[in-house]
Amino acid sequence: MTEFEKTYQNYNPRQAALDEARALLTAAAKAAMADGALPEAELPAFIVEIPADVKNGDIASNIAMAGARSWRKAPRMIADALLAHLPAMENSVFAKVEVAGPGFINLFLSQSFWASVVLGACANREYGRTDHGKGAKYNVEFVSANPTGPMHMGNARGGALGDCLAAVLDWSGYDVTREFYINDAGNQIQKFGKSLAVRYLQKYCGEETFPLPAECYQGGDIKVLAGEFADINGDKYVAACSGLSEEALFESEAFAQLKDALVAYALPKNIAALKRDLSKYRIDYDVWFHESTLHESGAVMAVVDKLLELGACYKAEDGAIMYRSAQYAAKYGTVNKKKTEDGTEEEAKDEVLVRANGIPTYFAADIAYHYNKLATRGFAKAIDVWGADHHGHVARMKGAMDAIGLHGEDLDVVLMQMVNLMRDGQPVRMSKRTGNAITLTDLLEEVPIDSARFLFNMHDAGSGIDFDLDQAVKTDNDNPVYYVQYAHARICSILKKMESEGVQFAGAEKVDATLLTEPSEMDLIRMLAAFPQEIVMAAEKYDPSRINRFVIDLASAFHRFYGNCRIQGADPAVQQARLALCIGVKNAIFNVLTMFKINVPEKM
């Protein structure tokens, strides 16, 4: 890396300009007060922002309006005083500063600033990456599907959302761990084993002899796993389970042994299938955390003991250990509600952490798991991506972190709305291939992975998605990911064509990018300037979808630029500047697509 290229490492021009504007206005206010032009007062809280209309400057501030009360002057008079006391701007990124309307201060960036944006985007292959997060350790846990069955469309969306969120955090300078929590303990696994065992017995004795209880898993995948187990082990478990009433069967040692054997066979297969499908979906986890390890290590009961010691729990008359949930959850919102005997709902107050029989609840394990993230492993933030149907669990989990001596604010939950699959404008609920509900496996057989990852990340988590299967397989501009990939391929084609005609790019350090002043050039440069800060904002707001929308707009701006500004046959100096701009846009698009693990074709 050359010294010139090092200049643009962690380059965030928009934020740098905003910071300089704030520093200039702060210095002007202090100078005006020292000079007597403004009365001595505490500096007001004020805003510096990017105005919607560039006619109102590249950056605007309300400092004069914000200071009207403390400085006891009209905003326009304050603004004039501030302008008169601005520091010398010879080395500033600003070309001029104006007062507008009742006292807005508008700052206009210099052409040399815009030129530096072009050169930075061109010279820095990782343009968009910053050190904003200063290496803070963040854990992003997402998907975490129950290993009792195949993954569904919610998992498909959660996978794209969680992985892309981890990516923007990484590009914003955070030390990110991607994590999957494997629910391999508790009631779900008991139900899984029971479902498998009944299906196994049905294979030899029929469904009338061993009917499947309504609370069991009804999916065809359970039949398949039970059948495979039977093919390997034969009927050796059948005799011991025969001739018993349903109640006696489910309480028998023979049935327990059958369940354990089936879970030992089926659970690893399901977990392997989860890993295989997620890897195909281009999701690579750093940690696969097994719930069972929390129980085996004693971590769950250690957390319960700590909560008892802190007074957040108490022992009920029947021996159960109760947690004062509402007391700690109240500051974070509504907790899950429970049904009363008359069928109405009331807010749960105290919740069971350990049942009277000594078995911990899932909630106890969940507290232990998040304690492990924040306390044992020391993450600054634990970010969970959950389905919106878990909204009632947010307050109780954040409250539990407070109760155990941590900070609920260090646990953030991204709630994700549902996905509707659409084809020909109509909802699709069943797979053509299997006749069952569409799984992630089914989706990835029908839809290109590039399309799936991009389209599932097109909307913020709080918005529902209508995923158009027809759009996802298109290879034209109706498919957003194709549109963005085509912009990259088009730039590659332009660069190759220029090379074939003997025009070599001289290098960013030799380009005079101040020559780029055409409106479509400036539109493109402004978008490039915003790119690193867009990634930071996506990370801060936990909304990677804003990067998808940004890169679509960037591709559109490039196509307009290319239609309006000649490269072939242009003045040599202008031509070099425009090539630098093309390379800068190419770098930005490349970085978005690779950040989100989407292919970046050089020709299409």
Task: Kindly give the residue locations of the regions a language model identified.
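Non-catalytic interaction-recognition regions
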Residues: T2-A115, R129-M604
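Short, charged, solvent-exposed linker or helix-capping segments at domain edges/interfaces
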Residues: S116-A121
